[in-house]
């Protein structure tokens, strides 16, 4: 790879990271980050990190995930939600979001090597990124704040583990579906544009 190509690649990564970080902030700070789906609110706030990780790798995805986490932390500090004190802990609000990038990239690359099918690989990466976000956040809540979380949502602390599993299932499945549909569409479109320019 020539010096010019390396410079072009670094510039592209910076642009992609900047644009998707901006989208992540908008989704995090506005109602656009939640899609009403019947009685559920399906989050789309993790999608920029997933798309960045597929297009540009784990570092870019991790940086965008960090931005997502920082927005979540800011909202916890400035908001009056009953769950705000829980999300003030970076282990809950930030770490799982940073891990979206590596989880997505390595799942995507692994499937790409195995199947050679772009859409399937992107979809698998999107599922991995979504699951690490949901399982990471809810897992840390259970490990660190089970009783406090139970009191905040009004359930018996003895059964809060089952409640969290139920939330992971009822929210995680539609979030995975939405993530796959949007990520496949966006990533294939961006790659198609890139190939035409070459």
Each PLM stretch: what is its role?
Residues 1-198:
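Loop-helix junctions at membrane interfaces
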């Amino acid at each position: 790879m020539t010096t010019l190509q390396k410079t072009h690649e670094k510039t592209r990564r910076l642009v992609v990271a900047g644009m998707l970080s901006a989208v992540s902030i908008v989704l995090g700070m506005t109602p656009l980050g939640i899609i009403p789906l019947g009685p559920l609110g399906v989050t789309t706030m993790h999608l920029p990190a997933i798309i960045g990780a597929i297009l540009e790798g784990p570092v870019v995805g991790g940086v965008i995930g960090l931005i997502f986490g920082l927005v979540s932390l800011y909202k916890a500090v400035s908001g009056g939600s009953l769950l705000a004190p829980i999300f003030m802990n970076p282990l809950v609000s930030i770490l799982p979001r940073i891990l979206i990038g590596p989880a997505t990239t390595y799942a995507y690359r692994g499937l790409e090597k195995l199947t050679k099918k772009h859409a399937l690989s992107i979809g698998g990466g999107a599922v991995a990124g979504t699951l690490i976000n949901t399982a990471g956040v809810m897992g840390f809540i259970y490990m660190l704040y089970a009783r406090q979380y139970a009191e905040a949502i009004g359930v018996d602390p003895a059964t809060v583990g089952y409640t969290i599993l139920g939330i992971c299932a009822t929210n995680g499945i539609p979030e995975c579906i939405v993530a796959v549909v949007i990520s496949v569409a966006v990533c294939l479109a961006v790659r198609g544009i890139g190939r035409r320019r070459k």
